[in-house]
């Protein structure tokens, strides 16, 4: 087999991504244990089943989630929503997740399979109606429940649950499909009162990513006590500014889910919407979520660039976000970025067809568009359009240098207000087609 230079370069980037973005250690919240196993659902024998359990009994846990708005909601999405609605987010003590099969568009039998996964874990932890379920993989196939059931039992019966770094990294690996690296982030924060707490998050995703009021597959857990109503608002706010601001290919999955559990293992007052620390926690969770969401884009299927689309000075935040999303989802913009072509006309085109809530957010006579270098090289900003006027003397050599960077920024200044929004996206390469052309095989 003749290996092309392009293929060799792609392999090098995959290795670099793993070494760059996968941690070698972490700090993890009190009162949780996680376990994972290769149940046999994945043909390659990789980890494909994971369980997270809250072991803290000092106070009841709380949970929140944000789900896909795709009309073909998968069985695990519908089942988890039902659990959260019936419990009002209180007393959720476990998450069970599988990869390799999405259990989507599988009818009533798929619903029964999702419920069976929940029931198996509930029985093992001795707490009814206490588990959420998540699945990812190929759509339209039923779960191999003989393997899933045996795998869940093995995790519990063989004492495969732990709170060490390897256990957390492995459960992050267990939700991967076309991912080239597991997404695991952990961090310790300090509140205004000096109390410290820990947050850990995992996500999977490299393709079928353009969430809307939800996001791919991921979960956060913390040892901070947070009331369920406050937790839902914190997670929604954070998601709207992180996972709802990423795009790889413009496709929204049937299974997109982000959930968060707060077990209150840290001895401090419960965070409510009226707490002095509420806004601080909301900000900390949001910045944490951005870090994790950006890892998904950095692992975009076949991608070679990480691109920040920064829309400034809009009349409203919503319109800034709509414009940033329109640019990020444009196939023509993404392919131009891959080809290192400074085709600013495609950017303006994507801005022009954005479905704005307030048309006054866009004034074609005042808009400016630039490429921004992120490697501290000068000139850092290369103006393409200024006050609605194309810059006919654009330095093509400098444009090529910026577009050759692994990280770069597209800056749009609307000059119609004071609101801003960011989206994170990647380019679209030949490799993306190769990966998705034979995904089921």
From Swiss-Prot:
Record flagged with keyword Repeat: no
Binding site for substrate: 177, 204, 215, 301, 436, 441
Pathway linked to the protein: Amino-acid biosynthesis; L-arginine biosynthesis; L-ornithine and N-acetyl-L-glutamate from L-glutamate and N(2)-acetyl-L-ornithine (cyclic): step 1/1; Amino-acid biosynthesis; L-arginine biosynthesis; N(2)-acetyl-L-ornithine from L-glutamate: step 1/4
Pfam families linked to this entry: ArgJ
Gene3D superfamilies named in the record: arginine biosynthesis bifunctional protein suprefamily, ArgJ beta chain, C-terminal domain, L-amino peptidase D-ALA esterase/amidase
Residue(s) at site: Involved in the stabilization of negative charge on the oxyanion by the formation of the oxyanion hole: 136-137
An example molecular function term from Gene Ontology annotations: L-glutamate N-acetyltransferase activity
Active site: 215
Documented EC number(s): 2.3.1.35, 2.3.1.1
GO cellular component, one term: mitochondrial matrix
Entry keyword annotation includes GTP-binding: no
UniProt-annotated site: Cleavage, residues: 214-215
Keywords noted in UniProt: Acyltransferase, Amino-acid biosynthesis, Arginine biosynthesis, Autocatalytic cleavage, Mitochondrion, Multifunctional enzyme, Transferase
PANTHER family the record matches: ARGININE BIOSYNTHESIS BIFUNCTIONAL PROTEIN ARGJ, ARGININE BIOSYNTHESIS BIFUNCTIONAL PROTEIN ARGJ, MITOCHONDRIAL
NCBIfam families in the record: ArgJ (TIGR00120), PRK05388.1 (NF003802)
Remarks, miscellaneous: This protein may be expected to contain an N-terminal transit peptide but none has been predicted.
Identification of the protein by name: Arginine biosynthesis bifunctional protein ArgJ, mitochondrial
Organism: Candida glabrata (strain ATCC 2001 / BCRC 20586 / JCM 3761 / NBRC 0622 / NRRL Y-65 / CBS 138)
